[in-house]
A protein has these predicted regions:
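Structural signal for well-ordered, non-membrane alpha-helices
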Residues: 20, 24, 50-51, 114-121, ...
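Alpha-helical packing segments of well-folded alpha/beta enzyme cores
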Residues: 19, 46-49, 109-116, 147-150
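Short, helix-capping/interhelical loops that line the mouth of catalytic, cofactor-
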Residues: 2-8, 56-108, 112
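Short hydrophobic/aromatic-rich motifs at helix boundaries and adjacent loops
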Residues: 21-22, 86-89, 122-126
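Conserved, structured core segments of small domains
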Residues: 31, 109, 113-124, 128
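Short, contiguous alpha-helical
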Residues: 29-83, 125-170
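Extreme N-terminal tail/first-helix region
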Residues: 1-24
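Amphipathic, non-membrane alpha-helical segments in soluble helical-bundle scaffolds
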Residues: 9-16, 32, 36-40, 99, ...
Length: 170
């Protein structure tokens, strides 16, 4: 087994505790700054993303193959950017898209998100390498860090997080 090289994330990447605090201080009526999702749809999207990392959402073979070939380059570029600098309105895997006609229950999505934060925080603390359904084996820090990055991007979309410096973590 080869050594897993860790990604460099910016210093403004929030912890799971900071993400929990941000979402618990918000509500279903949080106004979006861009995009088309409502706050409950965003939280369901974030939960679907978390579920995909846990293997709860199937990933098609062609997407897995493409992700294994190109994913690490893409992920390293994303990790080096602040969640504030992540491009808006990027393409989303169909299984993770939120239909505009679906109106999720904020409280249910919040409970699911809080449960996921506990699971991913425990994974990060344990430090055991993880098998990502699309990108293959990666460190627990990267596995969790990519999720925190994605979540922070969407929390910024709804003004749930304030901006911070963009220095790289070692």
């Amino acid at each position: 087994m080869s050594e897993i090289r860790e990604m460099k994330f910016t210093d403004d990447l929030p912890t799971w505790a900071e993400l929990r605090h941000a979402v618990e201080a918000s509500d279903a009526d949080a106004p979006r700054r861009w995009g088309s999702m409502s706050a409950p749809q965003m939280l369901r999207h974030v939960n679907a993303f978390c579920g995909s990392y846990m293997g709860e959402i199937p990933v098609s073979f062609p997407i897995r193959v493409a992700a294994r070939w190109l994913g690490k380059f893409f992920l390293n570029r994303v990790a080096r950017k602040s969640p504030l600098a992540t491009p808006k309105n990027m393409g989303t895997m169909p299984a993770l898209r939120q239909a505009p006609t679906v109106h999720p229950n904020w409280s249910e999505e919040l409970a699911q998100f809080l449960s996921y934060t506990e699971q991913f925080e425990a994974i990060e603390v344990a430090g055991n390498p993880q098998k990502h359904p699309m990108y293959g084996e990666m460190s627990a820090r990267d596995f969790s860090g990519l999720l925190r990055h994605h979540t922070a991007h969407h929390f910024h979309q709804f003004g749930l997080l304030s901006s911070a410096p963009k220095r790289l973590q070692s």
